[in-house]
Amino acid sequence: MSFLKSFPPPGSAEGLRQQQPETEAVLNGKGLGTGTLYIAESRLSWLDGSGLGFSLEYPTISLHAVSRDLNAYPREHLYVMVNAKFGEESKESVAEEEDSDDDVEPIAEFRFVPSDKSALEAMFTAMCECQALHPDPEDEDSDDYDGEEYDVEAHEQGQGDIPTFYTYEEGLSHLTAEGQATLERLEGMLSQSVSSQYNMAGVRTEDSTRDYEDGMEVDTTPTVAGQFEDADVDH
């Protein structure tokens, strides 16, 4: 694919946490070949035997998980969802965006399938640790409220404006199309939460993995259908 490039693999200088040889890379259901996966603090990279590969920046990774559902994919693997398009899909998405008024965020699904499935836990842990080093700037900004303070005393004297508050129903009407789509997606993810474990499109977080913001274990119980189905995962 055209997005595959030649570059030196990340080393200790980039904080290499995990190097997993004999790992097959799959993008949106299409195999890219077998190579080595490099999980470094700076980026997530994969290179095939010829030295061609790709790198993923952590801020673009919206979800990573260990998938053990053999109904969704025939082999256990590390699943990574990225907010971007790659290869031919990136060209198609540009054309679609020109014809569409909706601001739809691009999504790509990667599956990294190691020949040694026992390495999945170490791969998952390394991903969680590296992802934590790259917090979402939007989350940080939300902690610092820069808006004007509401002066109760001024309001009582008729000198201040009443801040606008919305009920749940009213708030929905003020959401943008993108906001509504995001809300619907999140509600769908949370609708199957059960006691201490939460099922989100086949992804389950348990107490042992709650410390990881973006990482989660996949539910292996047969009661959840459609876990990590291609092109409709989410997160």
UniProtKB/Swiss-Prot annotation:
Modification Phosphoserine, positions: S100, S142, S191, S193, S196, S208
**Listed InterPro entries:** ICln, ICln/Lot5/Saf5, PH-like_dom_sf
Subcellular localization is given as:
Cytoplasm, Cytosol; Nucleus; Cytoplasm, Cytoskeleton
Q: Which Gene3D superfamilies match?
A: Pleckstrin-homology domain (PH domain)/Phosphotyrosine-binding domain (PTB) (2.30.29.30)
Mark the residues carrying the PTM N-acetylserine.
Answer: S2
Recorded superkingdom = Eukaryota
Q: Which residues carry this modification: Phosphothreonine?
A: T221
Q: Name one GO molecular function term.
A: small molecule binding
Q: Which UniProt keyword terms apply here?
A: Acetylation, Cytoplasm, Cytoskeleton, mRNA processing, mRNA splicing, Nucleus, Phosphoprotein
Q: Could you tell me the Gene Ontology terms of the biological process aspect for this record?
A: cell volume homeostasis; chloride transmembrane transport; mRNA cis splicing, via spliceosome; potassium ion transmembrane transport; spliceosomal snRNP assembly
Keyword hit for Membrane: no
Biased composition of type Basic and acidic residues is found at 204-213
What changing G49A does, per the record, is: Removes cAMP sensitivity
- Outcome, altering G53A: Removes cAMP sensitivity
The annotated region (Disordered) lies at: 1-21, 133-157, 195-217
Q: Where is the composition biased (Acidic residues)?
A: 137-151
Span of the secretion signal? none
Q: Does the keyword Ligase apply?
A: no
Q: Which PANTHER family match?
A: CHLORIDE CONDUCTANCE REGULATORY PROTEIN ICLN (PTHR21399), METHYLOSOME SUBUNIT PICLN (PTHR21399:SF0)
**Subunit notes for this chain?**
Component of the methylosome, a 20S complex containing at least PRMT5/SKB1, WDR77/MEP50 and CLNS1A/pICln. May mediate SNRPD1 and SNRPD3 methylation. Forms a 6S pICln-Sm complex composed of CLNS1A/pICln, SNRPD1, SNRPD2, SNRPE, SNRPF and SNRPG; ring-like structure where CLNS1A/pICln mimics additional Sm proteins and which is unable to assemble into the core snRNP. Interacts with LSM10 and LSM11.
Stated role: Involved in both the assembly of spliceosomal snRNPs and the methylation of Sm proteins. Chaperone that regulates the assembly of spliceosomal U1, U2, U4 and U5 small nuclear ribonucleoproteins (snRNPs), the building blocks of the spliceosome, and thereby plays an important role in the splicing of cellular pre-mRNAs. Most spliceosomal snRNPs contain a common set of Sm proteins SNRPB, SNRPD1, SNRPD2, SNRPD3, SNRPE, SNRPF and SNRPG that assemble in a heptameric protein ring on the Sm site of the small nuclear RNA to form the core snRNP (Sm core).
Report the protein name in the record: Methylosome subunit pICln
What is the organism of origin for this protein?
Answer: Canis lupus familiaris
The uppermost taxa in this organism's lineage are: Eukaryota, Metazoa, Chordata, Craniata, Vertebrata
